[in-house]
From Swiss-Prot:
Matches recorded under InterPro entries: Kinetochore_Nuf2_N, Nuf2_N_sf
Record lineage: Eukaryota, Sar, Alveolata, Apicomplexa, Conoidasida
Family statement: Belongs to the NUF2 family.
GO biological process per UniProt: cell division
Keyword terms: Cell cycle, Cell division, Centromere, Chromosome, Coiled coil, Kinetochore, Mitosis
Protein name in UniProt: Kinetochore protein NUF2
Organism: Toxoplasma gondii (strain ATCC 50611 / Me49)
Coiled coil: 176-319, 358-460
Pfam family, one: Nuf2
Chain residue ranges for the region called Required for nuclear localization and function: 121-125
Compartments, record wording: Chromosome, Centromere, Kinetochore
Annotated GO CC locations: Ndc80 complex
């Protein structure tokens, strides 16, 4: 599918992930279209393809072939989408079809006959990528006629669109890469500065408002805040430890998946090797049988030769017997001729020549017998050696088969153990997620309850503040109506009687009765230093009492009450959140709160 000399996809291959409307011929002026006629010349296209190390024959531009058009589309898919033949036709490359569903456990789900569909799967994926590529380039909708009956104009238009897109991608990358990086860094820094400025302003306003009125309380809150921040840092460190442990478990999970895949591949390799060994084991006995038959034929041939030699020896023996008879006859003849030889020839010449001839014949017969016996021994030794080799091969075959069966059983046990461990890890992860969701729900409920409590307290503050204003006004009126010669005890009794008379039956009577002690203390503070100077100090004591009342009134204003309640609410909410986290962590990890022998907590690590 892929054309030769394809370049590696760049970092901007992700541009192909944008919708097709962004690169349509009606919305973008950078791509060629039929209504604008914006196309590149053939020479420019060839130069661009040469720059990308793609060689196209000249016949493709005049009479394109389906294979050439497919190669051009493959080059465009790899350059724009960053997908190679290993990504598009992975089934044909690996030779098997695998499922991406976790329920099938990433194993083969097609039989040997079903593997014929691997090519069809790759073709369907390739056609969908071609359709997506046409939409990205702003070309007409892709159809199978593009490959079945390609035209020169269509091929040139497609090549022009691809070159224009590659040029546009390179120019945009060179033009805006530094600006985009600079803008992203500036946005991050600006966001951080704005957040820091808001935090500083809020802290400054809060401290200015509380500094004059609540200096001791501010010190205590500051100390408590430092303690809470320290505890928060500890909680953050514990959370970081938990996150690291979660990441480690995820990494272990990923490694287990990879090892499981490796084991599956190793199991497949072992199966294939077992089949090959099984084929060898099946065929080798036939070869041994053939070899044994050949050896039997050879043994029969040697037996026949041995029989022939035995027959020859028997014939030689017969010849020897005949020769002995002949010798006897010759002796008789010699006896007959001896007289003649004695008379004619020397008697010893004939006898000496005869003995030499017989000795030579006896030596030749002995040598032949030794050679035959040696050949018989060699054949027997070769037969025994072949029998031993056959036994060794059978024993090795049995040992190898036993070893392979043991390896296969161990591999199966390891796969089952890893599957069980993976299931346990998944269950633990799901339990952690469920506990985190429960914690979030409880925190939301706690915030809602705190909000309702704050609203109710604010309403009560408004009521108390209104009652206090009414009461202070009545007190000032009564003070103005009191006789000047009364002492403090008489003034207090007169105030109580006058209040009971004037406000009997009022809805706020109960609340005012509860604050009689507070009014008495106000009267005591606002009274003059001596009874003798009562009249002279009366104009001064009344403004002083009024100022005291106003100051106490300011101390109990709704704004300061709200501030106190907000501070108390924040403290209460933070303490409740800390206690809730501690209870949840103790419930989830009971063993983590128990210190080890070295004084360390095993779940959260060393305390800071």
């Amino acid at each position: 599918m892929a054309a030769p000399g394809l370049p590696q996809p760049g970092s901007l291959s992700t541009l192909a992930g944008y919708p097709s409307s962004t690169y349509s011929s009606q919305n973008s002026p950078f791509f060629p279209s039929a209504d604008r006629g914006g196309r590149m010349t053939l020479e420019e296209i060839k130069r661009d393809f040469t720059k990308h190390k793609l060689e196209c024959p000249d016949t493709m531009w005049r009479e394109p072939q389906p294979e050439q058009v497919q190669g051009l589309y493959s080059f465009a898919i790899e350059s724009i989408f960053g997908l190679t033949v290993n990504d598009v036709r992975i089934e044909e490359v690996t030779g098997d079809v695998r499922s991406c569903l976790p329920s099938i456990d990433s194993l083969q789900f097609l039989s040997q006959d079903g593997r014929l569909h691997a090519k069809a799967i790759g073709n369907l994926r390739f056609i969908r990528l071609c359709q997506r590529l046409n939409r990205v380039l702003g070309l007409p909708e892709f159809s199978r006629e593009t490959f079945a009956s390609p035209t020169a104009s269509g091929v040139q238009r497609f090549a022009s669109a691809v070159c224009m897109l590659l040029r546009l991608r390179e120019s945009l990358c060179r033009q805006f890469e530094s600006q985009i990086q600079q803008r992203a860094s500036l946005q991050q820094s600006l966001q951080k500065l704005s957040q820091n400025a808001q935090l500083v302003e809020q802290e400054l306003l809060r401290f200015r408002a509380e500094r004059q009125t609540q200096q001791p309380l501010a010190q205590r809150q500051k100390q408590q805040q430092s303690e809470l921040e320290e505890e928060l840092r500890q909680r953050h460190s514990e959370l970081g430890a938990l996150m690291e442990e979660f990441k480690e478990r995820q990494a272990v999970h990923g490694r287990l998946e990879l090892e499981l895949g490796d084991l599956v591949l190793e199991l497949m390799n072992l199966k294939q090797e077992r089949e090959e060994l099984h084929d060898q084991v099946v065929h080798s006995p036939e070869k041994l049988m053939e070899r044994r038959d050949e050896l039997r034929v050879q043994q029969k041939h040697l037996d026949a030769q041995l029989q022939e030699l035995e027959n020859l020896a028997a014939s030689q023996q017969k010849l020897l017997l005949a020769f002995a008879k002949a010798v006897k006859k010759a002796k008789k003849a010699m006896e007959i001729l001896s007289a003649h030889r004695d008379q004619v020839l020397a008697p010893h010449l004939g006898f000496r020549s005869d003995m030499r001839t017989r000795e030579k014949l006896f030596r030749e017969l002995g040598e032949q017998k030794e050679q035959l016996s040696k050949a018989v021994q060699d054949l027997q030794a070769e037969r025994e050696e072949l029998a031993r080799q056959l036994e060794d091969q059978e024993r090795k075959k049995d040992e190898e088969e036993t070893e392979l069966r043991g390896h296969l059983a161990r591999a199966k046990r390891e796969v089952e153990e890893r599957k069980k461990a993976l299931a346990d890890q998944q269950d633990m992860t799901a339990a952690f997620l469920r506990e985190a969701e429960k914690l979030e729900e409880k925190l939301a409920e706690q915030k809602q309850r705190h909000k309702l409590l704050v609203d109710a307290i604010e309403e009560e503050i408004q009521k108390v503040y209104a009652a206090f204003l009414t009461y202070v006004s009545q007190m000032q009126f009564i003070r103005s109506q009191m006789p000047l010669s009364l002492d403090l005890s008489q003034s207090a009794s007169f105030l109580a009687e006058h209040s009971e008379k004037t406000h009997r039956g009022s809805p706020l009577a109960c609340e005012r009765e509860e604050n009689d002690d507070f009014l008495a203390s106000l009267l005591a503070e606002s009274s003059p230093s001596s009874l003798g100077e009562e009249k002279e100090n009366l104009p001064q004591s009344r403004p002083t009492a009024a100022a005291d009342a106003e100051r106490r009134l300011a101390d109990f204003s709704p704004e300061k009450g709200r501030k106190r309640l907000s501070c108390l609410d924040e403290e209460t909410e933070e303490e409740a959140r800390m206690h809730e986290r501690e209870r949840e962590s103790d419930r989830l990890f009971p063993a983590a709160r128990e210190p080890r022998e070295d004084g360390d907590f095993p779940m959260y690590g060393h305390a800071e």
